[in-house]
Amino acid sequence: MSYSGAGLGKPGSGKRRIRDLLTQSDNRVCADCGAPDPKWASANIGVFICLKCCGVHRSLGSHISKVLSVTLDEWSDEEVDSMIEIGGNASANSIYEAFIPEGSSKPGPDASHDQRMRFIRSKYEHQEFLKPSLRITSVRGSSTKTPAFLSSSLSKKIVDSFRTNSSSQQPQLEGMVEFIGLLKVTIKKGTNMAIRDMMSSDPYVVLTLGQQKAQSTVVKSNLNPVWNEELMLSVPHNYGSVKLQVFDYDTFSADDIMGEAEIDIQPLITSAMAFGDPEMFGDMQIGKWLKSHDNALIEDSIINIADGKVKQEVQIKLQNVESGELELEMEWLPLEQ
């Protein structure tokens, strides 16, 4: 039976152009706090941001800031073109930070989560630092402003997308999700994967949490693929299990399923929250996800503090398929850190 990796598209390119833009001097630090070496971007705003500010941007909702990883996510051509046309952090900040009131200041790299939240919401959601004539209010009469500005230097595509957001913002705000942290999943390797082509398969992994999807690269013609690839998911307050699926990439037809599994992330998050700041502790075991008849674990999955980070090694037997095992590592990144 064939399944398609719906909504993901084939693993693509575009990252090189984004990385080239990232090398500009103004883009080598976070647009919001100045932290060095940002690895995230707001595709609709046009700025590069650090991991800590990325968490705040995600909590605002994608209708305000659509966050993508420079290295981990697939970028559409339109998203890449928009980032390049805006020109980077200096250009965007010349609009969004045009009128910072006297006595107010940007947060620094070591600022608290609350300081970042206040500044970033003021900057993008409420547009408090824009020239008043550039602010756009909702056509529904809502007092909440869209994170948009009108500038001849910006592409018509971006402005049009802001106008669309303005007309439909209220129902989106009602469904806005607040996130509590980020889940970094390292897809390590697969073993004895199912054959879906003549003699082999071209496997890739898809992770789904709520409405989010993250996808690995394709490993060509390999039943024992090695990825060692990091994927990132935002975790909301009311989170469920992560759905893992493996597909066989096919150029001319729908990608075939190569197995799936449900990953319970509650033990990891509960253990991490119980201990608080992991940097306060030495290396130690703090939890365990137990193997049982109703999960896909090959063996008990241990949760450890290692080098100041909360990590969990997971080995799963893929379900609803004739063969295949997958090894991965999960790491919990709370937004408050």
Curated annotation (Swiss-Prot):
Residues 164-281 form the C2 domain. Ca(2+) binds at D250, S253, D256. Expressed in roots, leaves, flowers and siliques. Low levels of expression in seeds and stems. Residues 15-137 form the Arf-GAP domain. GTPase-activating protein (GAP) for ADP ribosylation factor (ARF). Binds phosphatidylinositol 3-monophosohate (PI-3-P) and anionic phospholipids. One of its GO terms (molecular function) is GTPase activator activity. Keywords: Calcium, Cell membrane, Golgi apparatus, GTPase activation, Membrane, Metal-binding, Zinc, Zinc-finger. GO terms for biological process: intracellular protein transport. The C2 domain binds anionic phospholipids promiscuously in the presence of calcium while the N-terminal region (1-174) show a specific affinity for phosphatidylinositol 3-monophosohate. The keyword Nucleus does not apply. This is ADP-ribosylation factor GTPase-activating protein AGD12. It comes from Arabidopsis thaliana. It is found in: Golgi apparatus; Cell membrane. Its cofactor is Ca(2+). One of its GO terms (cellular component) is plant-type vacuole. A zinc finger (C4-type) spans 30-53.
